[in-house]
């Protein structure tokens, strides 16, 4: 029988967690109730399968008793212990948790530690806001609790029941990855580089399972997480735009570890300058005041783009070059001299040959070329079909060197 782990703090959410447990059990799953309470006054309940002390013993560095009296430190410590506990369990067919901001922060890292495809549901009071810090590059399903997770009432019973039946359905009707003997290639795409990525995908799909990631910060993280996990045989990183948001302050930033997976794995890597002409913000009224006088373009009512200027382009090119210098596997980086996005072309709002020239020069002077690490300028626009052909050709060359 499939096993679902129900995780939360039984000292404050006991009735809700037991309600989840009972509904999931009634749906046909076995349940393991894991208590991660951190209150020093909490007493163990006999109907809990895994007590807090058992989870805490999984922490790699046992903390002193006085440290656990600080709630912030205790939550962080229990969260780390829970990660190690869940990793040690071979029978997690699915996991569900419920909590407020503290419980969400405690439980989410353990969910992120599980492989993609293992069902994960988190009922949370903070699920209607920015959930990126909790979900990260994984497939956690977050459900807004509507009312606080504080007792059972006419609202919480319905929300929790929906969550319980959701996780049960995911586990009992789980569909494994479709049988596909093709190796997987990761690609990064933004709306303004879509023609390029679609052309590359068409050229590769007969021989490769093409996994396309939207370059929205977490998209790049997912791309690299799969590379680190051994699920990709290489990458075509067309859209490195997340670097702009990271360095300038946009809403779709990469992490400082961008390109790190390819440095660690030495997988074949082909990259380009896709959408390095822009920084992303929300609706126009959310653009920070210091950028209001810059060249802005309304992409849609919820997304405003800002053109990167020469100074920013210099920093962006240098940062990418330095990160790629850490890669010792086959690296090809192609510069499309006639424009890096659909709106970086003659007559388009972000056409700026001067800024592009600064970007390209920064890449050239920073990237240290070797037999395996190469950079090339190409007199084409990034969305020109010939540029897509060159990306495919370079990937094939990188594979021959791998």
Curated annotation (Swiss-Prot):
Keywords associated with the record: Plasmid
The protein, known as: UPF0261 protein mll9388
Similarity-based family: Belongs to the UPF0261 family.
Keyword Thylakoid belongs to the record: no
Gene3D superfamilies, alphabetized: Uncharacterised protein family UPF0261, NC domain, Uncharacterised protein family UPF0261, NN domain
Signal peptide from the UniProt entry: none
Keyword flag Nucleotide-binding: no
Classification via HAMAP family: UPF0261
NCBIfam families, per database record: PRK02399.1-1 (NF002673), PRK02399.1-2 (NF002674)
């Amino acid at each position: 029988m499939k096993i679902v782990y129900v995780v939360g703090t039984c000292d404050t959410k006991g009735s809700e967690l037991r309600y989840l447990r009972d509904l999931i059990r009634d749906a046909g799953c076995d349940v393991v109730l894991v208590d991660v309470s951190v209150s020093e006054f909490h007493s163990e309940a006999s109907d809990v399968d895994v007590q807090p002390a058992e989870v805490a013993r999984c922490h790699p560095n046992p903390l002193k008793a006085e440290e656990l009296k600080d709630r912030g430190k205790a939550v962080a410590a229990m969260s780390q212990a829970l990660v190690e506990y869940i990793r040690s369990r071979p029978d997690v067919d699915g996991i569900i948790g419920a909590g407020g901001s503290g419980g969400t922060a405690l439980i989410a890292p353990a969910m992120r530690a599980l492989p993609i495809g293992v069902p994960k549901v988190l009922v949370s009071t903070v699920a209607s806001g920015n959930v990126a810090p909790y979900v990260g590059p994984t497939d956690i399903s977050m459900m807004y609790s509507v009312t606080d997770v504080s007792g059972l009432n006419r609202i919480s019973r319905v929300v929790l029941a929906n969550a319980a039946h959701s996780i049960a359905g995911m586990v009992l009707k789980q569909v494994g990855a479709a049988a596909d003997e093709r190796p997987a290639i990761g690609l990064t795409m933004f709306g303004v580089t879509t023609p390029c990525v679609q052309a590359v995908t068409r050229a590769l799909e007969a021989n490769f399972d093409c996994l396309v990631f939207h370059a929205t910060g977490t998209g790049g993280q997912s791309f690299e997480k799969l590379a680190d996990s051994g699920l990709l045989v290489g990458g075509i990183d067309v859209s490195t735009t997340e670097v702009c948001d990271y360095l300038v302050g946009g809403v779709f930033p990469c992490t400082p570890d961008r390109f790190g997976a390819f440095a660690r794995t030495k997988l074949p890597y082909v990259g380009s300058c896709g959408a390095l002409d822009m920084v992303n913000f929300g609706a126009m009224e959310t653009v920070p005041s210091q950028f209001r006088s810059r060249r802005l373009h309304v992409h849609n009512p919820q997304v405003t783009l800002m053109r990167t200027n020469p100074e920013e382009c210099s920093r962006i090119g240098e940062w990418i070059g330095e990160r790629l210098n850490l890669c010792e596997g086959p690296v090809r980086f192609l510069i499309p001299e006639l424009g890096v996005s659909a709106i970086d072309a003659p007559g388009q709002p972000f056409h700026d040959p001067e800024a592009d020239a600064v970007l390209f020069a920064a890449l050239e002077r920073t990237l240290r070329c070797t037999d395996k690490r190469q950079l090339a300028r190409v007199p084409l626009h990034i969305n020109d079909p010939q540029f897509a052909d060159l990306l495919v050709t370079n990937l094939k060359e990188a594979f021959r060197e791998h």
